[in-house]
């Protein structure tokens, strides 16, 4: 890769139609896990103008009012007016859940005991990543993209910019020099708005109130290109503007394209699904490796076969930044982390109703108390085993 290059990531707000679907799916998952933590859940959501469809496979003893959970989620996001294209009070909600296939269940239904040989819920490959670009050990472009749409939502909620509406998208382009962030090149922010705000006022307010307070001062060098609502009017948005589906924002959910993705979405899936739990474990492993000072950049790949507990492969790539070899780090991963599905569930305490919060603004790089996969509690042990110095601010 060239020494001087641009890299871009995007994010979307909680009111984006695909994120509405993700949040409904995870709200339903949480409601089920709150009553029956051993449930099998694959909750998919479709949302369109005035309509929500709930489908998938659920096996549980929980008694959940799925329709009310969906309405409550839509209300929390801010779709409380028919002018917005969907209103939590009047939208139709259709429910079409089946039970998990017994052919799948036979390989994963050993979860009620302490048997660590619970098989993976499906085959697949998952990635985890961490780097030193931010204190959260996340790539800078996706981190800033998340913070922009998060701030848009906060300003909408507290009434400082009352003409904002729930749907929004952000995109940040960062200039890298010698592999490190040098400056911010371009910021794109498109936000849904009420029809009575003129474009000039909107653009000035978004730049001054949303964008500039979010950008790190040390990365503002020269003129930044600000593109706010570049097509102009953005009144029709949310599920009215586009049909939303669970699992369509998997790059937004992870590393913004800075690392590979195995293809499996997260939202609506209980932790027996390694699409979710193993990706969380991959982040946990990679973050602890970087926090331990073993490398300044780390990518983990794990893979599984359905019904089999042990990963079929574990790969570590530190892109030449390792203080010890990738082979040594791989051995340390196998010694310090149990990457069997049940081992991951126990290690990260995943059988809890913690997932709705993860369904907007990124599953990674957020220091929420529920997000155990963001802990660096193994950094000191890894550093001691490898003979490196941990990152002081991150090793717990």
UniProtKB/Swiss-Prot annotation:
Main location: cytoplasm
CDD domains: S-AdoMet_synt
Family annotation (Gene3D superfamilies): 3.30.300.10
Binding, Mg(2+): 18
Class in the EC hierarchy, top level: transferase
One GO MF term: methionine adenosyltransferase activity
Cofactor(s) recorded in Swiss-Prot or TrEMBL: Mg(2+); K(+)
Reactions this protein catalyses: L-methionine + ATP + H2O = S-adenosyl-L-methionine + phosphate + diphosphate
Transmembrane segments: none
Chain intervals for the UniProt region annotation (Flexible loop): 100-110
Superkingdom of this protein's organism: Bacteria
Residues bound to L-methionine: 57, 100, 242, 273
Record-linked Pfam families: S-AdoMet_synt_C, S-AdoMet_synt_M, S-AdoMet_synt_N
Keywords, alphabetical: ATP-binding, Cytoplasm, Magnesium, Metal-binding, Nucleotide-binding, One-carbon metabolism, Potassium, Transferase
InterPro entries to which the protein is assigned, alphabetical: ADOMET_SYNTHASE_CS, S-AdoMet_synt_C, S-AdoMet_synt_central, S-AdoMet_synt_N, S-AdoMet_synthetase, S-AdoMet_synthetase_sfam
Cofactor note: Binds 2 divalent ions per subunit.
Positions bound to ATP: 16, 167-169, 233-234, 242, 248-249, 265, 269
GO cellular component assignments: cytoplasm
Family to which this protein belongs: Belongs to the AdoMet synthase family.
Subunit relationships: Homotetramer; dimer of dimers.
HAMAP family per UniProt: S_AdoMet_synth1
Protein name, entry field: S-adenosylmethionine synthase
Phylogenetic lineage: Bacteria, Pseudomonadati, Pseudomonadota, Betaproteobacteria, Burkholderiales
């Amino acid at each position: 890769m060239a020494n001087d290059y641009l890299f871009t990531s995007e994010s979307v707000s909680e009111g984006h139609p695909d994120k509405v679907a993700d949040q409904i799916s995870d709200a339903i998952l949480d409601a089920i896990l709150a009553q029956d933590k051993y449930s099998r859940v694959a909750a998919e959501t479709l949302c369109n103008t005035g309509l929500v469809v709930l489908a998938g496979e659920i096996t549980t003893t929980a008694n959940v009012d799925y329709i009310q959970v969906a309405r409550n989620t839509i209300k929390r996001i801010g779709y409380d007016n028919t002018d917005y294209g969907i209103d939590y009070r009047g939208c139709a909600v259709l429910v079409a859940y089946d039970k998990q296939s017994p052919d799948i269940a036979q390989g994963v239904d050993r979860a009620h005991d302490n048997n660590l040989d619970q098989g993976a819920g499906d085959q697949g490959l998952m990635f985890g990543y961490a780097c030193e670009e931010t204190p959260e050990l996340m790539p800078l472009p996706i981190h800033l993209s998340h913070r922009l749409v998060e701030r848009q939502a906060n300003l909408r909620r507290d009434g400082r910019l009352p003409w904002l509406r729930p749907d929004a998208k952000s995109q940040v382009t960062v200039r890298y020099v010698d592999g490190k962030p040098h400056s911010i090149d371009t910021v794109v922010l498109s936000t849904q708005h009420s029809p009575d705000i003129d474009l000039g006022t909107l653009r000035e307010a978004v730049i001054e109130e949303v964008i500039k307070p979010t950008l790190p001062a040390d990365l503002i060098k020269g003129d930044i290109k600000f593109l706010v609502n570049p097509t102009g009017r953005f009144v029709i948005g949310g599920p009215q503007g586009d049909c939303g589906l669970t699992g369509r924002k998997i790059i937004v959910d992870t590393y913004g394209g800075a690392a590979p993705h195995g293809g499996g979405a997260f939202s609506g899936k209980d932790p027996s699904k390694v699409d979710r739990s193993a990706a969380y474990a991959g982040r946990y492993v990679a973050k602890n490796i970087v926090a331990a000072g073993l490398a300044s950049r780390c990518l983990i790949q794990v893979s599984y076969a359905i019904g089999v507990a042990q990963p079929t492969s574990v790969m570590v790539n530190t892109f030449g930044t390792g203080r010890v070899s990738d082979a040594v780090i791989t051995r340390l991963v196998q010694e310090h982390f149990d990457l069997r599905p049940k081992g991951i569930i126990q290690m990260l305490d995943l059988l809890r109703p913690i997932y709705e919060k993860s369904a907007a603004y990124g599953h990674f790089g957020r220091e929420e108390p529920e997000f155990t996969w963001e802990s660096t509690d193994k950094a000191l042990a890894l550093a001691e085993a490898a003979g490196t110095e941990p990152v002081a601010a991150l090793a717990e």
